């Protein structure tokens, strides 16, 4: 794990006892989701939804993490056409898998827009390479 991808948090374990807990940062989680979305043999729309959620909460990749993602794209020879093709796969049929994972009102809201908001979040995330 990249050192910049680790955050340390104080967690109270009982009265007067504090433990230091290390966890992946939200930025690092976004990097992992960005890689998973493109590298999985079978695309999972839950990755697209997670990317959307992280982006909606203001998470962006810093320069170091963007460069790491670029290294991954180059190593796996993923070009703009492949990225665009993966994004296009985020359609109503594939997004039906989200019905079992999301509250019905969230799913229905996404479905009304034909899941376009997920594709927009992906286009924004990968804009540097599209």
Predicted regions and their residues:
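Structured mid-to-C-terminal alpha-helical surface segments
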Residues: 1-130
